[in-house]
Regions:
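Residues at secondary-structure transition points
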Residues: 6, 13, 37, 52, ...
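C-terminal regulatory/oligomerization modules of transcriptional regulators
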Residues: 1-4, 125-152
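Alpha-helical linker/hinge and terminal dimerization helices associated
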Residues: 15-25, 61, 104, 108-120, ...
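N-terminal leader segment of winged-helix/HTH proteins
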Residues: 1-33
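Charged, amphipathic alpha-helical coiled-coil/dimerization segments
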Residues: 74-133
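Short, locally clustered residues in the helix-turn-helix/winged-helix DNA-binding domain
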Residues: 44-48, 109, 136
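N-terminal helix-turn-helix DNA-binding core of bacterial DNA-binding proteins
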Residues: 24-67
Length: 152
């Protein structure tokens, strides 16, 4: 590898450490409410997704079906969610908050979203859009390169 590439890679890893820090902060936030990080992001997904299903959560969060099922069962047993059969697909159930669950989720998620809002406001929407565009491009190219190696 050439020296210039190594410098860029070092800069990239500094950015990657920033993403890891974001996840670590989010995990600490979740723990302050007695939740695992995974249960927190699933709760967040239910809160922000209309007619949410386990399939949607698995797809959006890239989580295994079993992991999502365990979290859904946890929230169900706590009385925070109810599962309603989808009339269009009887094998699928949509996830809805109970009154208690809605209060529980609002207490956790709305505070977190307020922090997100304040952060985005400081950084600026244009910078956020650029960041997302670059991150998605990088991920797509990287996935293609890794797939080439895997499929050899």
């Amino acid at each position: 590898m050439d020296e210039e590439f190594e410098q860029y890679l070092a800069k990239f890893y500094k950015g990657y450490k920033g993403m890891q820090l974001f996840n670590s902060i989010s995990e600490s936030y979740a723990k302050s409410f007695g939740l695992s990080y995974v249960n927190f992001i699933i709760l967040y997904s239910i809160f922000t997704t209309e007619n949410c299903t386990q399939t949607i959560i698995c797809k959006n969060l890239s989580l295994p079906k079993q992991t999502v099922n365990i979290a859904i069962t946890y929230f169900y047993k706590k009385g925070y969610i109810k599962l309603i059969e989808n009339p269009e697909n009887r094998r699928e159930k949509t996830i809805h908050f109970t009154e208690e669950g809605k209060k529980y989720a609002e207490n956790i998620i709305l505070k977190f979203q307020e922090c997100e809002y304040k952060t985005i406001k400081v950084i600026g929407l244009e910078n956020i859009e650029t960041f997302i565009k670059i991150l998605n491009s990088y991920a797509e190219i990287w996935q293609n390169e890794i797939t080439k190696i895997i499929n050899k």
